[in-house]
Every structure is written in structure tokens, then in C-alpha cells.
């Protein structure tokens, strides 16, 4: 018999390399065939419900790494709750209406103007469903578990019907109105936009300082006086109706040398302006307060129109002249100013951003950006332009087309936020936020939010269920809206475009505003944020196994102005409360330099490629390791690093499996009271680790959980317990108490880790589970254990923590001895340890083989005051001296012992190994051992 055959070398077929790209897909197929998600739901019937409601991604294009981070984070929570005593169904959703899908069809050569609306809408639907199928495959391949065969889509008939009923609640409460107001207008999309559909970029604008001659100075200013007006949008000057001044500003009347005109500017800006305009020598001839200018009129610089001077607090002295050109059809402030002074709301520009003939000669047919130059030229021709200069400032863009937008007054439908603002703010108080600053952010957004423009001039979406009577009166009655909802539930929203208005109204419907029984219908559709914002009614309130409000919404931080926001508004209107009990927000995924990922930059990471090259588990572990509450930088190098951490976890599982392969939990388990002290210590540590991990999971703090996990695996297991375990597990007799004691804890660690990590690494833990003799077919169908406490554990931990401090000194001295070439491996060392009486008592109280715990061949303990001068001294009074151990190396345990060969039958073994072999392999006493 060989020496090797007398050892209990761990054995397992669990592979060191996971071959994840191949094995994960096979395992996912197995889950699907065995309906593991459905089995888990069945197991949890009757338990408390936890619902994470999925914010629907847009059904267009491939998933990106941000999608992966979001969906995997949700999967962590749903899987964890499912294994922790909750019924946690997960219904994935998709946002399937909207402009990008229309654009995709246009790019593919379809012209919506050359086909019927229903034909075009059918093509949109077909495209959206294909995108859903594609994204669903990708999400499933990330290991995300859920109702993939029964998701929610905003184009579903039932969802559209629910959305119409939500609209009905707004109508019933008088929160809808139609008005001609300036809205964000996207000429590239030919539609109004909501705030959530706008992003800001820095642009360089052409600004103009120009003059308007006083026409009626109210006896205070003469006709040879000119107001110096400033604008950042010269193309809007043809629509100018007024000049706004601040009532509290002091204004100077200035007469520059070599100019017979007098100019009015804000006194605080005079010095800066004089420098810009080259007024080296000027005289201030008068002062007046802004409020004195109110009611004066000026002459438009190049059109035959009188302009009013009015008061506005929004005029600042940060830039310009303190006098602002005002066009009520082109901005919120201008609009409110216009309403205050009863000015025309005038926006002479078409849907494509092209100016119309109402702007005057030279402007008709000119694109608004080109019209800047036309306007500047006209100002110059009329001797009204004092200065033109560039200005860099933040400007709104269409978030989908990436083109700049304009403010334009058009007839739109609005939701009055003002009427219910306080109710919405009150509802926020009942919500818990992660991170906590989310509350302030959402609160401020609601506080500052203007009325919500919900109409869109597009075709692929849910129609506004509004009818018009013969005299133009809008009809939004409960009866008509409910009837439309019923039609949508039966036929889908296409019915709106297929039928005449009279065929969409309830049978026999009459209205006093239509004496002839004639009606028309609205042609605009709803903002897609109204679609997804209605999901609490279309999904949570519709499916009886879900709950409303949901327990949790988890999305990117941009959703404070998007889905969190629109869902909150609609929910408060429908039910008087928020649709969620908790919100978790995440940052964006950026490249390694902190730049936004974009195809044009070539810095996009495709999660599908990472899956194909490394496996979904690597992405999942990365998500756990990332601080997702802020923006996350990621590169392929990040995944390489995570692969190393994964390899460490995998090898930990392999070591635990190998060294429990001959352990039967039912027969070999040692009770806590009978465990060796070091094993008790590790069992207590394991349960403290489990408690912390569960707390982190409960708080959705997966980053901290990752740190706790890596610390436990690297320090408690790899660097200590698994390191010292080899001597016990390999060397001691197979059935010895000390070995079974350690295996008991090993198995507990294995069982805890495999269950605890299933929400994070389900492919790997299911693979590990297949090598364990547990009754359940899938680890996903088990429960994560609750942490246990043990009698006297605090005292035990205190002792062992003190010992670990002593051990750290010994390890440091051993490292120095290795560096000095005094020893090679630690097993070549003898350690002389010099301790105080308290420290010696500590070691004795552990009742352990301290030499084994230190990993050396010989240990001698002495009083602290006997420490020689060349010993390593440590602050707590410990001294350590490392020398080369005397004796020969035992062929079995590899320790250097003076008693090697003391048993003549085993000349190559130390006394300890000889006794173990003689007792367990008696035949070798005569035959001897081979190397």
C-alpha cells in the first residue's frame, strides 16, 4: 500500500473550471423543462407576498449592460425573498409604444403617410413584439427568473383598457384641460414632449443685443430713447410682443459719446455692457426703477408692431441687459407674462421647425436655426443691432432623436399637477427610499413640476379617449370613457382608428352640444409615460396574485423624473397613495473613464458578448460587487477581475465538496456541544456571517454583502479554517471524532453558502447542489437558513479573537523567516512562543492543538520574561522566535518530527501517523508502505 492510500484525500468530480458559457445554458433549459419558477411559486402559496414591480424597458434594440445590471439586481431580490419565506412572483414588462418604433419602421422604408393608420400601427405592433422576444431571450440568459411566458406589455388589450380607465379617473376629478401653451416641441419627432423625455446638452447660441425705440414713454422717456434688449434666440424676435424688466432693478438712461441716441440698461450691468459695446465715454443722464417702465411701449425693431413693457421677477442681472425680449408663444415665462398682460399667444412655426409667413418677409420656409441669421441681418439693416456674441449654455434636446427642441405654443391636453400637488407630496411620506436622498429628489421634482402635457401628435400609442361635440366641446364623461375601455379590452386600441366617432360611443348616446348627433374624435395619442405610469392598474391591480401597492420599484435614477414620477401621479389620482412602499434607485453604467457609453464612441459593452466569453455568472457577481446606488464604471477588465473572484468562490465550493464527499449528515454529524473548539468557533463565525449577509440582502445592500462574502471566504475560510483543516481531514483517521467534528462544520458551511449564494449565482449553486446528497432536486426550492445562536458564543469568540491576534504575530515572524531563507515552508519551522500568564491560560483554555493551528512542526511555549533578545517582540507582550525544526520529514503528514521512525514497522512515519496507520490499516504493519 502506498502512503498516499492511507490519506483521506478529498474527492469530487465538481470541475475546477466552470465552462460557464456552455453549462449555464444547459442548466437554464433544465429549469425551464422542470418549471422551477412555477414550482417555487407553488411552494410559497399561503406565505406573505413580496412584489417587486418591473419598470418596463423599451422594446427597441439589444439589451445593454445597464439593462443587465437592473434586471440582475431585481433577480437578486426576488430570488432571495422566494427563499426567505415570501411568495415573490416576478412579472417582467415591456414599454411597447412610442416614437422610436415609428422611427425604426421609417428607417426600414415604411412611409406612414402612404398607408392607413391601422396598417402602420400593425407594423409597429409586429416590430415591438419581435423586440420583446429578442430581449426576453437575452434576459433569461442572464439567469433572471420570472413569468417570461406571461409578461405584461403596454400594447396588451387588457393593459390599454386599464390605462383608459386611469385616464377616466383624471377626467372624473377635473384634472384634464386643453390649452394653447408653450410645450417642449420636438421638430425631429413632430410631437410635444414631456419633461421626462428631455435631456440637456451644452450648446453655443447666437445672442443679440438690440434696441427698440420708445414709442410711448408715459412722459418719463423721450422718443429718442431706446431700450437695449437681449435675446439668446434671435429667430423668435418676429414673434416678440413685449419687453420684460425687473420691477426692483435700477435702470440707467445712458448717452454715449458720438451717438445722439439714449439707451436704457440695468445699472448693475452697465459697466460690463459699456465695455462690450465700446462705450468708452458715456453720460448717465437719468435713473428710474423697473416698475416705472411698466406700460410704456416700444417700436418692434423691424416689424410694424408696438411692443409693451411689463414687469417680471424672472429677469436677472446675471447676463444681458436687464431687459428681455418676450414672445409669449415660445416659452413658459413668456407665456405667463403674456397671460398677465393679455398679449397674443403667437408661435408662427410649423411642426417641422420651419417658420411660417406670419413672421414677415424673408422668414417663410426658413428652418428656425437658420432664421437666427435672417433675424440678425434684419436687425442690422434697421440699425438696431448693437452686438452679436456666442454664448455657451445648457439647452434641451429630444432624448430619443438627440436633436435640439424648441418651446412652442400649441393646442395640447394637460394634466393639472397644481390641483393635486399637495396630495402627491403627502403620498411620498409613506415611502422608504434607497438611497435616502431619493426622497428629497423626488419631492423637489414634484414640487417644481409644471402641468403634464399628455397629448402626442403621433400614431403608435394609446389614443386619448376624447370626443368633440358639434360646437367643439370636449366630451370626457364616465359613460363614454368606460365604453371605450370595454372596446379596447375586446378589440385593442386599433379600434379607435378603425371606427367613426359615432361607432365608438355607447349606443344611443346623446349630448346637448351635438343637437344633430354628430361627433368627432381626438387624433392625438397619450404620452408613453402615461402608458407605463398606469402599470399599477394594468398589472398590479389586475393580477390577483400581485399586490397594490407593490413592495418595491427598482430602476435607474433617471426614473425619479420618469416612471417613479408618472406612476406616483397616476396612483395618487386613482387610489390616493403611492404605487410603491419602497424605491431603490441605481446609477448609470459608464466606461472605465467615466464617459457615457455610446456606439459612436465605441465604448459600449454588450452583455451578450460577456455571457458568450465568460458566462452570465460573471456579470451577476459584478452586479453584486458594484456600488449601484451611484454611477458604475465598467470595462472588460472589470469582468476579468471579477472572474478571479468567481474562481476563488468556485474553488472554495470544490474544496468543501471534496472534503465532505465521505460525510453523511444523517450519520456523521457531531452535536455542537461535542465539536472541537476551533470548529465551534467557525460555526459561530459562519452564523454571524449569515446574519450580516441576510441583513444586507434585506436592505438591498449587495455591495456590502459582497465585501462580507469575500472577507469570509478569503480570510476566515481560505487563510485560516481550510488551511488548518488539511491536517485534520487528510491525516486523521476517517471516522475519528476530530475529523467528523470538522466535517460537520464544513458541511454546514457548504450548505449555508450554496443556499445563500443561489440568489446571486444560481447556475453555480445548482451545479454544486447536484454533487450534494440533498433530497430536493433544485437548491432554488430550498430555504435560506436563519442564523443560529449558541450558548456561550460571545465568550468563545472573544477567546478566539485573542488567539487570532497571537497567531497573526506568529505568521508575521514565519514570513520574515522565509524571506531570510531560514525556512522554506512553515512546516519546516519550530516556533518558540513567549507569553504572559494570561496569554498562556488563553491557549490552554482553547483545548486545541495550537501547533496545528499555527501550521508549524514544533511549538514550545515559555514565560514572556524568558524571551531572548533576538526574538520578534510585539506590542501586546508576545515574543516569537522561529528556528528550523529538528528531525526528519514525515512521509505522510509532511511535518518535521524527531520521532520519525520510532515505530520500526513504519520507518518513514512520525509516531502520530504510525499510530493512525497501524490502527486503520493493520496489514501494513507487516507489508510496510511504499512512497
From Swiss-Prot:
Organism, scientific name: Limosilactobacillus reuteri subsp. reuteri (strain JCM 1112) (Lactobacillus reuteri)
Domain of life assignment: Bacteria
UniProt short sequence motif 'KMSKS' region, positions renumbered to this chain: 596-600
Catalytic activity: tRNA(Ile) + L-isoleucine + ATP = L-isoleucyl-tRNA(Ile) + AMP + diphosphate
Documented EC number(s): 6.1.1.5
Localization in the cell: Cytoplasm
GO MF: aminoacyl-tRNA deacylase activity; ATP binding; isoleucine-tRNA ligase activity; tRNA binding; zinc ion binding
Positions bound to L-isoleucyl-5'-AMP: 555
EC top class, as a word: ligase
GO cellular component: cytosol
NCBIfam families noted in UniProt: ileS
Protein name: Isoleucine--tRNA ligase
Residue sites binding Zn(2+) per the record: 890, 893, 910, 913
List of residues binding ATP: 599
GO terms (BP aspect): isoleucyl-tRNA aminoacylation
Similarity comment: Belongs to the class-I aminoacyl-tRNA synthetase family. IleS type 1 subfamily.
Keywords assigned by UniProt, alphabetized: Aminoacyl-tRNA synthetase, ATP-binding, Cytoplasm, Ligase, Metal-binding, Nucleotide-binding, Protein biosynthesis, Zinc
Record's cofactor remark: Binds 1 zinc ion per subunit.
Subunit record text: Monomer.
Cofactors required: Zn(2+)
Reported function: Catalyzes the attachment of isoleucine to tRNA(Ile). As IleRS can inadvertently accommodate and process structurally similar amino acids such as valine, to avoid such errors it has two additional distinct tRNA(Ile)-dependent editing activities. One activity is designated as 'pretransfer' editing and involves the hydrolysis of activated Val-AMP. The other activity is designated 'posttransfer' editing and involves deacylation of mischarged Val-tRNA(Ile).
Motif 'HIGH' region, residue numbers: 57-67
InterPro entries in the record: aa-tRNA-synth_I_CS, aa-tRNA-synth_Ia, Anticodon_Ile_BEm, Ile-tRNA-ligase, Ile-tRNA-ligase_type1, Ile-tRNA_ligase, M/V/L/I-tRNA-synth_anticd-bd, Rossmann-like_a/b/a_fold
Domain description: IleRS has two distinct active sites: one for aminoacylation and one for editing. The misactivated valine is translocated from the active site to the editing site, which sterically excludes the correctly activated isoleucine. The single editing site contains two valyl binding pockets, one specific for each substrate (Val-AMP or Val-tRNA(Ile)).
SUPFAM superfamilies found in the cross-reference section: Anticodon-binding domain of a subclass of class I aminoacyl-tRNA synthetases, Nucleotidylyl transferase, ValRS/IleRS/LeuRS editing domain
Amino acid at each position: 500500500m502506498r502512503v498516499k492510500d492511507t490519506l483521506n484525500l478529498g474527492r469530487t468530480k465538481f470541475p475546477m473550471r466552470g465552462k460557464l458559457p456552455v453549462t449555464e445554458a444547459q442548466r437554464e433549459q433544465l429549469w425551464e423543462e422542470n418549471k422551477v419558477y412555477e414550482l417555487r411559486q407553488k411552494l410559497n402559496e399561503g406565505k406573505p407576498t413580496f412584489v417587486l414591480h418591473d419598470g418596463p424597458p423599451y422594446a427597441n434594440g439589444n439589451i445593454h449592460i445597464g439593462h443587465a445590471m437592473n434586471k440582475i439586481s431585481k433577480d437578486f431580490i426576488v430570488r432571495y425573498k422566494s427563499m426567505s419565506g415570501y411568495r415573490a412572483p416576478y412579472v417582467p414588462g415591456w414599454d411597447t409604444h412610442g416614437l422610436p418604433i415609428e422611427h425604426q419602421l421609417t428607417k426600414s422604408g415604411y412611409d406612414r403617410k402612404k398607408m392607413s393608420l391601422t396598417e402602420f400601427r400593425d407594423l409597429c405592433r409586429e416590430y415591438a413584439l419581435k423586440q420583446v422576444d429578442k430581449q426576453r431571450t437575452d434576459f433569461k440568459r442572464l439567469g433572471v427568473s420570472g413569468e417570461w411566458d406571461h409578461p405584461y406589455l403596454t400594447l396588451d388589450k387588457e393593459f390599454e383598457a386599464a390605462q383608459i380607465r386611469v385616464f377616466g379617473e383624471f377626467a372624473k376629478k377635473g384634472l384634464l384641460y386643453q390649452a394653447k401653451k408653450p410645450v417642449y416641441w420636438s421638430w425631429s419627432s413632430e410631437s410635444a414632449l414631456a419633461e421626462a423625455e428631455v435631456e440637456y446638452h451644452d450648446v453655443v447660441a447666437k445672442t443679440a443685443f438690440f434696441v427698440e425705440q420708445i414709442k410711448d414713454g408715459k412722459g418719463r422717456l423721450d422718443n429718442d430713447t431706446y431700450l437695449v434688449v437681449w435675446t439668446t434666440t434671435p429667430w423668435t424676435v418676429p414673434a416678440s410682443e413685449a419687453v420684460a424688466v425687473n420691477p426692483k432693478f435700477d435702470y440707467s438712461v445712458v448717452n454715449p459719446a458720438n451717438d445722439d441716441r439714449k439707451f436704457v440698461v440695468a445699472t448693475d450691468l452697465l459697466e460690463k455692457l459699456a465695455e462690450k459695446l465700446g462705450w468708452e465715454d458715456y453720460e448717465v443722464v437719468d435713473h428710474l426703477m423697473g416698475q416705472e417702465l411698466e406700460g410704456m411701449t416700444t417700436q418692434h425693431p423691424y416689424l410694424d408692431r408696438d411692443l409693451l413693457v411689463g414687469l417680471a421677477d424672472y429677469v436677472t442681472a446675471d447676463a444681458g441687459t436687464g431687459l428681455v425680449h418676450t414672445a409669449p408663444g415660445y416659452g413658459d415665462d413668456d407665456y405667463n407674462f403674456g397671460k398677465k398682460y393679455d398679449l397674443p399667444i403667437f408661435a408662427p412655426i410649423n411642426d417641422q421647425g420651419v417658420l411660417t409667413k406670419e413672421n414677415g418677409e424673408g422668414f417663410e420656409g426658413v428652418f428656425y436655426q437658420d432664421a437666427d441669421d435672417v433675424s440678425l441681418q434684419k436687425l442690422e439693416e434697421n440699425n438696431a443691432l448693437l452686438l452679436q456674441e456666442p454664448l455657451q449654455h445648457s439647452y434641451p434636446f429630444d432624448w430619443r432623436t438627440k436633436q435640439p427642441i424648441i418651446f412652442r405654443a400649441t393646442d395640447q391636453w394637460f394634466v393639472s399637477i397644481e390641483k393635486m400637488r399637495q396630495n402627491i407630496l403627502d403620498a411620498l411620506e409613506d415611502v422608504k427610499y434607497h438611497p435616502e436622498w431619493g426622497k428629497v429628489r423626488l419631492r423637489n421634482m414634484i414640487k417644481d413640476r409644471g402641468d403634464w402635457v399628455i397629448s402626442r401628435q403621433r400614431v403608435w400609442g394609446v389614443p386619448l379617449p376624447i370626443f368633440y361635440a358639434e360646437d367643439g366641446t370636449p366630451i370626457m364623461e364616465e359613460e363614454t370613457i368606460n365604453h371605450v375601455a370595454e372596446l379596447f379590452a375586446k378589440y385593442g386600441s386599433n379600434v379607435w382608428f378603425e371606427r367613426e366617432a359615432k361607432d365608438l360611443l355607447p349606443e344611443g348616446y346623446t349630448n346637448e352640444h351635438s343637437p344633430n348627433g354628430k361627433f368627432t374624435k381626438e387624433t392625438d395619442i397619450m404620452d408613453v409615460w402615461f402608458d407605463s405610469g398606469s402599470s399599477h392598474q394594468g398589472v398590479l391591480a389586475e393580477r390577483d396574485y400581485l399586490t397594490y401597492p407593490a413592495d418595491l420599484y427598482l430602476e435607474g435614477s433617471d426614473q425619479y423624473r420618469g416612471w417613479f414620477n408618472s406612476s406616483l401621479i397616476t396612483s395618487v389620482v386613482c387610489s390616493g397613495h403611492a404605487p410603491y412602499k419602497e424605491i431603490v434607485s441605481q446609477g448609470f453604467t459608464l466606461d472605465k473613464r467615466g464617459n457615457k457609453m455610446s456606439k459612436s464612441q465605441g465604448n459600449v459593452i454588450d452583455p451578450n458578448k460577456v455571457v458568450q466569453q465568460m458566462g452570465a455568472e460573471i456579470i451577476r457577481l459584478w452586479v453584486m460587487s458594484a456600488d449601484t446606488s451611484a454611477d458604475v464604471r465598467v470595462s472588460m477588465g472589470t469582468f476579468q477581475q471579477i472572474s478571479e473572484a468567481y474562481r476563488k468562490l468556485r474553488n472554495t465550493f470544490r474544496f468543501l465538496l471534496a472534503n465532505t464527499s465521505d460525510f453523511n449528515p444523517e450519520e456523521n454529524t457531531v452535536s455542537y456541544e461535542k465539536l472541537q473548539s476551533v470548529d465551534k468557533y467557525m460555526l459561530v463565525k459562519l452564523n454571524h456571517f449569515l446574519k450580516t449577509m441576510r441583513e444586507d440582502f434585506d436592505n438591498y445592500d449587495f455591495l456590502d454583502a459582497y465585501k462580507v462574502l469575500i472577507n469570509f471566504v478569503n480570510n476566515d475560510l481560505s487563510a485560516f479554517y481550510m488551511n488548518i483543516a488539511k491536517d485534520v481531514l487528510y491525516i486523521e483517521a476517517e471516522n475519528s471524532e476530530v475529523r467528523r467534528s470538522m466535517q460537520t462544520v464544513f458541511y454546514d458551511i457548504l450548505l449555508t453558502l450554496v443556499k445563500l449564494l443561489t440568489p446571486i449565482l444560481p447556475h453555480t449553486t445548482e451545479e454544486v447542489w447536484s454533487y450534494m446528497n440533498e433530497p430536493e432536486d433544485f437548491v432554488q426550492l430550498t430555504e435560506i437558513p436563519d442564523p443560529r445562536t449558541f450558548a456561550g458564543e460571545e465568550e468563545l469568540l472573544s477567546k478566539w479573537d485573542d488567539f487570532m491576534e497571537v497567531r497573526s504575530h506568529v505568521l508575521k515572524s514565519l514570513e520574515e523567516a522565509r524571506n531570510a531563507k531560514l525556512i522554506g515552508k512553515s512546516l519546516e519551522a519550530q516556533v518558540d512562543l513567549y507569553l504572559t500568564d494570561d496569554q498562556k491560560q488563553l491557549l490552554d483554555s482553547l483545548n486545541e492543538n495550537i501547533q496545528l493551528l499555527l501550521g508549524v512542526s514544533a511549538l514550545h511555549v515559555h514565560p514572556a520574561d524568558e524571551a531572548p533578545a533576538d526574538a520578534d517582540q510585539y506590542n501586546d507582550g508576545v515574543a516569537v522566535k522561529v528556528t528550523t525544526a529538528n528531525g526528519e520529514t514525515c512521509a505522510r503528514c509532511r511535518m518535521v518530527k524527531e520521532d520519525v521512525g520510532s515505530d520500526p514497522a513504519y520507518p518513514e512515519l512520525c509516531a502520530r501517523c504510525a499510530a493512525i496507520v497501524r490502527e486503520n490499516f493493520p496489514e501494513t504493519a507487516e507489508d510496510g508502505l511504499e512512497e
